[in-house]
């Protein structure tokens, strides 16, 4: 649903129109924004402005992300890498400008091991600070940064 929108980082306003961050911060209270939208060649990803409070195991993370807002979930491995890459194109600054936090924690993805016969207790995590995507026990505790495909 890109519709000729330039790659970049935007804030969705109340009617779901995308506003460039530099325009958004001119508002009386820019911290009213709850999410940013990352537009790339791969699509439009809406990202919560901060991690959910607390730590979660894999199943708890999936549930908490889904309860954040309708349509939200944990990011895929690919989306986590896109978020990391965007840190160097202004994503961290966008979060800060709307009162959020950079996505630099170790968080759950939405993906369990694709071969449950090998290890049904494993799932993928990402390190937002280093860009590392790896494997962890589903019962460990990690952060949750909810995301969603942006819908107008």
Spans of model-derived segments:
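Extracellular adhesion/carbohydrate-recognition regions
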Residues: 1-72, 105, 109, 119-122, ...
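An exposed tryptophan-centered "aromatic clamp" motif
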Residues: 58-73, 77-138, 147-152
